[in-house]
Amino acid sequence: MGRKSSKAKEKKQKRLEERAAMDAVCAKVDAANRLGDPLEAFPVFKKYDRNGLNVSIECKRVSGLEPATVDWAFDLTKTNMQTMYEQSEWGWKDREKREEMTDDRAWYLIAWENSSIPVAFSHFRFDVECGDEVLYCYEVQLESKVRRKGLGKFLIQILQLMANSTQMKKVMLTVFKHNHGAYQFFREALQFEIDDSSPSMSGCCGEDCSYEILSRRTKFGDSQHSHTGGHCGGCCH
C-alpha cells in the first residue's frame, strides 16, 4: 500500500506542477494581451524610411481599427492568398478568413504611407501553442508597390522584438509549401526553423499536408521544445 500511495502522490504532485507551469504561461500571455500598445516602448520601429519607402507603423488590436482598414486588410489578403489557399486542402472561404482576422484576440501592425494610405500589415496574436507562450503570426501582407524593399522583413523583426519584450518563447507562423517565395523568405532570410509541431515533424500527415509550421525562438525559448501539459492550439480562456 505504501508504494501505491507514493505513486499516487507523485502523480498528483506532477499534475500540480504541470498546472502551475501552465498558469505561468497563461499569465504571460494575458499580460501581453493587456498591453495598450506593444510597440510603444520602441518608437524607432514606428518608422520605415529605406529603399524609397517612407511609412509609419502602428500596432493596434482589431477592435481599435476602423472598419475600412479591416476591409482593406481582408481584401489584400484575398488578393494575395486566395489562389494559394485553393491549391491546399483548406480551400478559401471568405467567411472563415474574415472571422479569423476579426477575432477579439487579433493584433495588427499596420504600415501607413503618408499617414493615411495602408500599404502593409501583419495580423498576430499572443497565444499558447503546445504548452508554450508564443507570438503567432497569422498574416504578413504587402501591397505590390511596396514589396522587395525590406518592409516585410522589418515587420517580422518587429514581431520578434515584441515577442522578446513580452517574454514569449518564440514567434510562430504557418506557410504553404507551394508558396515558394514566402517559404524561402522565412527559412533563409529570417532563419525560421520547421517547428516540432509541424506535420512533417510530428508525423500526423507529413508529406500529405500542404503547409509547414515554422518558428524562431526568442531569448526566452528553450533549446529544445518542451511540452508543459498544454495542447497544441490551446489558449488561456
UniProtKB/Swiss-Prot annotation:
The keyword Cytoplasm appears for this protein: yes
Acyltransferase found in the keyword field: yes
Pfam families in the record: Acetyltransf_1
Catalytic activity line of the entry: N-terminal L-seryl-[histone H4] + acetyl-CoA = N-terminal N(alpha)-acetyl-L-seryl-[histone H4] + CoA + H(+); N-terminal L-seryl-[histone H2A] + acetyl-CoA = N-terminal N(alpha)-acetyl-L-seryl-[histone H2A] + CoA + H(+)
Entry GO CC: centriolar satellite; cytosol; nucleoplasm
GO BP annotations listed: lipid metabolic process
One function term, GO molecular function aspect: protein N-terminal-serine acetyltransferase activity
Lipidation (N-myristoyl glycine): G2
Chief location bin: cytoplasm
Location in the cell: Cytoplasm; Nucleus
Phenotype of the disrupted gene, per the record: Liver-specific knockout male mice have decreased body mass and are protected from age-associated hepatic steatosis. Male mice show a reduction in the liver triglyceride and free fatty acid levels. No effect on liver cholesterol level, liver weight, and liver function is observed.
Residues at which acetyl-CoA binds: V140, Q141, L142, R148, K149, G150, L151, G152, K153, N179
Binding positions (substrate): Y85, D127, V128, E129, Y138, T174, S197, Y211
Keywords: Acyltransferase, Cytoplasm, Lipoprotein, Myristate, Nucleus, Transferase
Role noted for this protein: N-alpha-acetyltransferase that specifically mediates the acetylation of the N-terminal residues of histones H4 and H2A. In contrast to other N-alpha-acetyltransferase, has a very specific selectivity for histones H4 and H2A N-terminus and specifically recognizes the 'Ser-Gly-Arg-Gly sequence'. Acts as a negative regulator of apoptosis. May play a role in hepatic lipid metabolism.
Family recorded in the similarity comment: Belongs to the acetyltransferase family. NAA40 subfamily.
Name this polypeptide is given: N-alpha-acetyltransferase 40
Record gene name: Naa40
